[in-house]
């Protein structure tokens, strides 16, 4: 289900505070966060946010096309481990 339009987009308070401070000082630095459920808002555009994927922080540069999506959509958590081929020729 999508979020109701009556409500504001969800952004963790400490993340929005960091972005507001950087925008006021007009600085660009990497913001580290574990909040994958926060929505990308227009104030985040132009910043690099390092999103935790369960193992490490994955840096993502926020563009205008990402506004409205969640941060976790751009930091994959699973890596596909391919099964070994059952190749009978290699066994001979």
From Swiss-Prot:
Keyword Translocase among record annotations: no
Molecular function terms, GO-annotated: rRNA binding; structural constituent of ribosome
Pfam families xrefs: Ribosomal_S19
InterPro entries: Ribosomal_uS19 (IPR002222), Ribosomal_uS19_bac-type (IPR005732), Ribosomal_uS19_CS (IPR020934), Ribosomal_uS19_SF (IPR023575)
GO BP annotation list: ribosomal small subunit assembly; translation
Top-rank taxon: Eukaryota
Signal peptide: none
Cellular compartments annotated: Plastid, Chloroplast
GO cellular component, one term: mitochondrial small ribosomal subunit
Keywords annotated in UniProt: Chloroplast, Plastid, Ribonucleoprotein, Ribosomal protein, RNA-binding, rRNA-binding
Gene3D superfamilies in alphabetical order: 30s Ribosomal Protein S19, Chain A (3.30.860.10)
Record-linked SUPFAM superfamilies: Ribosomal protein S19
Broad class of where this protein is predominantly found: plastid
HAMAP family: Ribosomal_uS19
Function, in words: Protein S19 forms a complex with S13 that binds strongly to the 16S ribosomal RNA.
Family note: Belongs to the universal ribosomal protein uS19 family.
Protein name stated in the entry: Small ribosomal subunit protein uS19c
Species of provenance: Dioscorea elephantipes
Gene of this entry: rps19
């Amino acid at each position: 289900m999508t979020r109701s339009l009556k409500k504001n987009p969800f952004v963790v308070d400490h993340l929005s505070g960091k972005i507001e401070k950087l925008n006021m000082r007009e600085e660009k630095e990497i913001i580290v966060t574990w909040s994958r459920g926060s929505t990308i808002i227009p104030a985040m555009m132009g910043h690099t946010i390092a999103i935790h994927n369960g193992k490490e922080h994955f840096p993502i540069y926020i563009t205008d096309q990402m506004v409205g999506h969640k941060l976790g959509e751009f930091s994959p958590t699973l890596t596909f481990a391919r099964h070994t081929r059952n190749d009978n020729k290699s066994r001979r």
